[in-house]
Each structure stands twice: as structure tokens, then as C-alpha cells.
Design a protein with these regions (language model features):
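Helix-turn-helix
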Residues: 6-9, 16-55
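Residues in soluble alpha-helical coiled-coils and helical-bundle/repeat scaffolds
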Residues: 47-51, 77, 114-118, 132, ...
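Short, basic, alpha-helical segments at the C-terminal edge of helix-turn-helix-like DNA-binding modules
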Residues: 58-65
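Long, intrinsically disordered low-complexity tandem-repeat segments
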Residues: 204-236
Length: 237
């Protein structure tokens, strides 16, 4: 086996081990046992385990991002419903229980990154990658008039934070069983945050009208009560 092939086999072994047991399982001995070589050989090809763990993490999560985002083409969003449909599919995909192996890798990377600067840097890079991709989708939606312009970054950040949080919760079974419904509610919150000002204004106007009607009703009731009061007193007298 050539040096390149040997290095590739070590990487593939580490990738498989991480998917099965998470990043915390990546030790020189565990990888060596997985590949069927000596620990010394693994250490020879990958002398820095911190950097190797970062490489394994980056490879797995970058592949997932490419797979998920490939479902979005460059065609314009004709309306908000079309944007909603596309994003709903994306969220449902990311919340799918079949992806819990990648979720565990993300969660462990956030924790291990506190002591592994190479991993921390790669985590930031991959999160920036997700933020950039999602911003691009929302920016296209804004250009097509589906959401308010200038809110793509906020919408992308909110979507990413909610998906990451809900996925982390699911690892300890602290999440609704109906993930599809969870996805719909999450998406509604994101799109409401990026709704055009006209729509927000309409909601405010409706709320204001309701308040005005309520106030008018109370005023009318008060006047009616006042007009009845003198009559009542006169009758009593």
C-alpha cells in the first residue's frame, strides 16, 4: 500500500469511527484498531491528533452541508410559499433522526473545541459556511420580493441557531416527537422575523384597529352607564 493509500485508509477509518461513536472516540489506539495497523503507524501519518480531529469533523459536516444545500437550485422564488416549501424541506432534513450521528459530532465539537484550538477554528469555519449559504438563500428570496431586503443575515442566524439547538435537545430526547411540526413552527418564526415591513405594518394596523374598537366600546359603555345613572337616581328619589 502506497503512503497516499495508507493515509487515506487511516482517514476513512477515523471518519467511520467518528460517525459511529462521535469525536470523543478518536484516539490513536482506537483508530489503529479500526484500520488494523499499529498505533505507531497512525501517529506517523497523523502526528497531531488535535489537527486530525479537526480534519475529521470538517470533512463530515462539510459533506452534509453540500448534500443538504444541493437541493436548492438557482431558480427564483416566485413567492413566500415557494420559499417556505424549500426551507421546510431543508429544516426537516436537518432535523431528521437519521442525522443524529452528525448532530452528536457537532455537539461534541463545540465542547471539545474549548480545549482544541484547531478544532475550534474549524468549527467556526464550518458554522460560517452554513451562515453564508443560508444568507445566500434568504438574499435571493429578498431579491425576488419574498422577504424584506436587508434581513437575510438575521433570518439565517435565527434559522441556524434554532436547528442547532433543537438537534442538540433531541440527543437527550428533549424535543417533540413530531419533528415535522417542530420544523413548521421553527420556519414560521424565522419567516416572521424577515417579513416585509408592509406585512408587519398591516399586523400592527390590525392590532391598532382592534385596540381602537375596544377603547370605543368601553367609552360607549361608560357613557351609557353615566346616562342611566341620573335617571336611576331621580327614580329612586
Amino acid at each position: 500500500m502506497s503512503p497516499q493509500e495508507r493515509d487515506h485508509s487511516i482517514l476513512e477509518g477515523a471518519l467511520g469511527l467518528a460517525r459511529e461513536s462521535g469525536l470523543e472516540s478518536l484516539t490513536v489506539r482506537a483508530i489503529a484498531a479500526r484500520v488494523g495497523v499499529t498505533p505507531a503507524l497512525v501517529a506517523h501519518y497523523r502526528p497531531g491528533m488535535d489537527a486530525f480531529v479537526a480534519d475529521v469533523f470538517g470533512s463530515i459536516v462539510a459533506d452534509e452541508r453540500e448534500e443538504v444545500i444541493s437541493a436548492f437550485d438557482d431558480s427564483p422564488f416566485r413567492d413566500t410559499d415557494e420559499l417556505r416549501g424549500g426551507l421546510l424541506r431543508l429544516i426537516e432534513t436537518l432535523l431528521d433522526a437519521d442525522r443524529d450521528d452528525v448532530t452528536l459530532i457537532w455537539v461534541q465539537a463545540w465542547a471539545l473545541g474549548a480545549r482544541n484550538e484547531a478544532l475550534a477554528a474549524r468549527v467556526r469555519q464550518e458554522m460560517d459556511g452554513w451562515q453564508s449559504v443560508l444568507e445566500g438563500i434568504f438574499a435571493r428570496a429578498a431579491a425576488d420580493g419574498a422577504i424584506e431586503a436587508g434581513r437575510a443575515d438575521t433570518a439565517a442566524w435565527l434559522l441556524l441557531a434554532m436547528v442547532d439547538g433543537m438537534n442538540a435537545h433531541s440527543l437527550v430526547k428533549w424535543a417533540p416527537r413530531d419533528r415535522a411540526d417542530l420544523a413548521r413552527r421553527a420556519l414560521s418564526a424565522v419567516l416572521d422575523s424577515a417579513a416585509p415591513d408592509a406585512l408587519v405594518g398591516a399586523r400592527s394596523s390590525d392590532a391598532g384597529s382592534a385596540d381602537t374598537r375596544s377603547t370605543d366600546t368601553r367609552s360607549t359603555d361608560a357613557r351609557s352607564t353615566d346616562s342611566r345613572s341620573p335617571d336611576s337616581r331621580s327614580t329612586d328619589t
